[in-house]
Amino acid sequence: RDPDEDDVTPPTVAVTRPGDLWLLGKHRLLCADSRDAAAVARLLDGERAHLLFTSPPYANQRDYTTGGIANWDALMQGVFGAARAALREDAQILVNLGLVHRDNEWQPYWDGWIEWMRSQGWRRFGWYVWDQSVTVPGDWAGRLAPRHEFVFHFNRRSRKPNKTVPCTWAGHETHLRADGSSTAMR
C-alpha cells in the first residue's frame, strides 16, 4: 500500500481534541474556536501578529459537521473581535471569500460584516481578485463557471508591505543539470 494515496479513510473518532496545541518548528497550530480570545492568546504565546490571512466559510453554503452556520455575521464578528487583541496596531487583515448564489442571483453576504469591520476601525484598504485560472467543473445553472474569488484587505493605517522574504539560496546555483552544469542563461 502506498502511504501517499488519497483514498485513506479518516478515523471515525477524531484524534485531535479542542485545546490540543501542536508545535511545528517555529509554527504553532491550535485546535480551538477562533472566536475564543483566550484560545487565540494561547496560540500566539504573548506575540502579536502582523498579518491575519484567512478563508472563512462562504455564508451558509455548506453543511459542516456542526450543522452549518446559523448567523454568518455573528460568526465573523466573533472571530475578528477575538483577533483584535492578537494583532499589532499596524496589522493587515486579508480575507478570501467566494460568491454565493441564492434564488438565481449572487448574494452580497459580506456587506453587514464589512460595515461592522469599519465600525471597529478597520479600513477597506483593498479589494482584490484572486484568479484561480482553472475552471471548477459542474453545473453552474447557466452561469460561466467561477474562476476567481475575492480577497478583502483591511487595515487601521497604511504600512508599506514587505513583499519579499530573504532567500536562503540567493546567489547560489540551485537548478543544475544531471552532469552538474548550470541551467542559468548567461
Predicted segment positions?
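Core catalytic lobe of class I
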Residues: 1-186
